[in-house]
Amino acid sequence: MTEQDKQAVKRMLAQCLSRDREVTKVVVFGSFLTSETPHDIDVAVFQDSGEGYLPLALRYRKRTRAVSRIIPLDIIPVGSRAGSGPFLAEIAKGEVIYER
């Protein structure tokens, strides 16, 4: 996947996920950023909704269906009250592609 292809995928993701008012930030992390041949894309969706993990994950997957036809997605909703830890530290190393 070329760098131009990756940029296009990130723009599509930001466009798809920015429609939901509860979404405050979208971060792409993991091997998609560093590999020339990524197998998937890890996406953290920071949001301030009171909904549970599963309904949010399903909604965001539905919104990003066009992107998933290009490359498989792993979407992780992250609540506004998320603390800290190794997983959030890994997300913090990623690239913010949208922020409200």
What kind of feature is each model-predicted range?
Residues 1-27, 33-38, 46-100:
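Catalytic core of pol beta-like nucleotidyltransferases
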Residues 42:
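Cell-envelope/extracellular polymer assembly enzymes that use nucleotide-activated donors
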